[in-house]
Each structure stands twice: as structure tokens, then as C-alpha cells.
Amino acid sequence: MSISSSVAVLNVVQVSPPTAPVNNAFQDRISLTHFDLLALRAPPNQRLFFYETHLPISAFAETVIPKLRDSLSLTLQNFRPLAGTLIWSLHSDEPYIRIKDDDSVPLTIAETDADPQKLFDDPFQQETDLQQLLPPLRVSETEASLLALQITLFPSGDICLGITFHHAAQDGASLALFLKSWAHICRHGDDPPLPQNLIPIFDRDFIDDPKNIKQLFLDHLLTPLTPGGPRNRSVKPMEKPFNDRMHGSFRLTVDDIENLRRRITSLQVQNTSQEPPVRMSTVVVTCAYVLTCFVKAGLTKKHVRFILPADLRKRLQPPVPDNYYGNCVFGCTVDMSSDDLAGQDGLVVAAKTISSVVSELDANDHRTFFENFLLNNTISQEETKVGVGGSIYFSLDEKDFGWGGPKHLKNVPPWPNHIYLAERRDGDKGVDFCLMLAKQEMAEFESKFLDDLKLLEKRSC
């Protein structure tokens, strides 16, 4: 369904936190950790949350927008750095978030005559269409905003909350914390006190760096673009390497996941040389299956570099609080052969390899992983990079602004060949994920994905 020509921007409101901050710990800047630097130039992350308000159209301007705008301002009392600016000046050894009294977050107000149900019913959309529901960040080589929001009204009274954020300021867990806090304030009204678990911690001292990993990344980032050129202080995110791709939504049901587990176990019994996977978690099983579908659909080259992000908040010593705001994620990287993944034991190979690298992350010094990342960050011509984003462990129901949780969610992957896991409703044991691929590639993947699920179902009968 094409909606690109039907979205009209009505207004852009600059929303500032109240003049008197409730958190006096905020100074004029916040430093970045090595986890933040890892994402300094990554493409912006984007989310689309669709809500049924059950309100008349007239309430959009009279009630919905004022409520969202005012609660956003109150939320920024505790999340003040999100209204700041990421900069890397010529006089600074490192980038930082600058905080000023006149900082604000842009809130775009838009409307469309598109039918949202058609958008939900069709699992495939053009990426350019979805971008019409998403606001841009203000970015340049020297400065970048951290957050932009857009509210779009549909004729049915449904609304879409579009979010674009700079990854250097926050990871998925931090964004989820911000949205839960905003939703809590919006839902309760009149500046309610936030529960302690919804108050962010921006103190960078929680990220211990005794081996100076941060300097490794600063040296890497400052490398001149050309030999003998100036040191590279750009904070501009990379542009997405595609704008003509299809966005595809897929789902693995509880039965699908159990069938996959049984298939892995069966293959292990047949091949005694293979050790059982260290983990049979839902994420490992899902990623293993999707990765083998990628390979069987002919979407990879001779080798695959698979990147699975791991939240290190509880893995660091000492552990980092759950409400720490920033990045605390590292991508576990492992190389695999496409021939091995396409073979009869491909599902086992993928599951075992993915689970083992996570176990290795638990047991090893994190500096080693960062050093290996810098040494092996280039992709050869015979290698395809397949990454994972998002999380199934964030709850959609916690994003209730007063109209119930989102009816639908669409993540917009920042990279091609990126498996983006979606948040789930409480009690949902299935997995939704999305991909961004060229139209023909999407058709090939869908065919292999569905056909192999049917084979698994027959084997389980």
C-alpha cells in the first residue's frame, strides 16, 4: 500500500523540558562510553507504533496532541540529555552530548488519508512509504540531534508514533525506558512522580573501563578518511544504504519454535559428532532458522559473518543498573560457511555456533571482543554480513499512553540483511521479526521461510 503521497505535515513543535530540571546532576555535557562510540556513526534507529485511540477525529488536535506534547515535556525533566546535541569540536579529544537551557525535541504533527488496516494486513511495504511516518534527525558533520518524534493521524482515528533516534545516545533498552516513562506520565497526567525503576541514570561512572577500551575506539574513529588528511571528527550517522527495499514482516508461532527445537534435537541424535547446543533459547532458535533461510534463498556469499547483540548490563563487573541510560550492548560476531548452513545439519550448525559465542562472551574479557571487532571490521568480497537488532524481551503493553498498548509495531532495520526482532505483548510466546530486502530477495526468502516451516510441521506430525 502506497502512503507516501498522502502524508501531510501540519506542524513541527519544539518540545523543551521545564525550565527547572528535577535532576540537578545534569551539567553542560555528558561524555560517551566505549559502548556509545561503537554506535557513533551507525544509521539512525527507527520505530513505528500504531495505536487505536477510539476517539473522534476532533479529539486529535484538542486532546491527543496537547496530552502527548505536555507529557513529553515533563518526561524530559528526567531525560534532559535527549534534547541535547551530539558534537565533536576541534578542541575536544572526544565527542560528547552538549546540554543547553534552550534544548528541545522536535515533535512533528502529520495526517494521512491512508487506510491503516491495509498497512497492517499487508506484510510487505516499500521502505520509502514507511519513511513518511518517521521524522528526520537534524544532523551535520559536526552536530547531531539525538531524538525526533512524529505523530500521524489516520482517518479511522488511529495514530502512529514514529521515532528516530541517534544510536550513540541510547540502545534499545534505554529507548524502552524512555517510552515507558513517557507513557506513564501521559497516562496518569498532572506530573505524577515516576517510579524509581523508570528514572534514568546517566552517570557514566557505572561503565567501568580499566583497560581503556574507549581509547581504542577513539583512535579508530579519528582515523583520517584520506592519508594525510584531517582527523575524522564526524558525528553524522551513515545514510541507509538503500531506499528502494521492501519491508517484510514475518512470524514464528509457538508451535513453529517448538518444531524447530525438536528438529535440532533430532539432528543431534543422528549426528553424534555434534555436541548439543549450549542454549536452546527462543532467540537462538529463531536466529538459527532465519539465518539458514537466508542462505538457502541464495542471499549470502561463500561466508556469513553473523552479529548477535548482547546486553551487557548484568554481565559487567560490577553489574550496571537496569535503568542506566546509554549504550551497554556489544555485537557478538561469528563467521560461518554458507555451505555448512545450507547442508542437512545447517540448523544445528547455526544454533550451536550462535549459542557458543554468547557463552564465550559470558566467560571472557570484553576487551578481547572489542579488539577483535576493530581488527576484523572489514567484510571481504566473499562474505555477507547478517545482523540482529531489536529484542523480544521488551513489552509492547508498557507503551500505553492512555489508549491501551500499541496495536501494531513496525521496526525499520538500519541495514539490509538485518533481522529485526519485535517487542511482544505480555504472554506472547511467538516471535515477530522484520527484514529489509530487495523485492526479488524478499520473495525468495518468504518462499524458503514458509516452505521449510511446512516441512517441519509434517515431520512433527
From Swiss-Prot:
Keyword Transferase in record: yes
Active site feature: 167 (proton acceptor), 400 (proton acceptor)
Enzyme class: transferase
GO molecular function, one term: flavonol-3-O-beta-glucoside O-malonyltransferase activity
Motif (HXXXD motif): 167-171
Positions annotated to bind malonyl-CoA: 281-282
Record bears the keyword Transmembrane: no
Extra remark beyond the main annotation: MAT1 protein-coding gene was acquired from plants through a plant-to-insect horizontal gene transfer event.
Name of the protein in question: Phenolic glucoside malonyltransferase 1
Protein source organism: Bemisia tabaci
Top-level taxonomy: Eukaryota, Metazoa, Ecdysozoa, Arthropoda, Hexapoda
This protein's encoding gene: MAT1
